[in-house]
Amino acid sequence: MNAASLVQRVAGISGALAVAAGAYGAHGFRRSEASDYQRELFDTANKYHFYHSLALLGAARCRKPALAGVILLTGMGCFCGPLYHQPLTNDPSFSKLAPIGGSLLIVGWAAMAL
């Protein structure tokens, strides 16, 4: 399997997970005792998860799909992961990864231009 095909498959899985997380956020998490801030964090994570799942589809078509794909996927994990984790667990210990993840997302978009 070539890099473009792998990145495209990962994008599909990521998109499916974003839909599942969005459904949980809309139907399960919303009914919990979460604060408005926790709901906002979860919604932000889900929004960026969706956006960057679509970006992965684009990365599969760029000149260096493996490079762009790895950077975007790492950025998604470091940005969306802590934003999903904190409202679900009330544990902010991973929140320091979010700025690193955001920076990687920017670099990932730029990598698609290479």
From Swiss-Prot:
One Pfam family, short name: DUF423
Keywords: Membrane, Signal, Transmembrane, Transmembrane helix
Localization (cell): Membrane
Residue numbers on the Extracellular membrane side: 26-64
InterPro entries linked: DUF423 (IPR006696)
UniProt topology in membrane: Multi-pass membrane protein
Ranges that cross the membrane: 65-85, 94-114
One Gene Ontology cellular component annotation held by this UniProt entry: membrane
UniProt signal peptide: 1-25
Side Cytoplasmic, residues: 86-93
Major localisation: membrane
UniProt keyword Membrane, yes or no: yes
Family membership: Belongs to the TMEM256 family.
PANTHER family: TRANSMEMBRANE PROTEIN 256 (PTHR43461:SF1)
Protein name (database record): Transmembrane protein 256
Organism name: Danio rerio
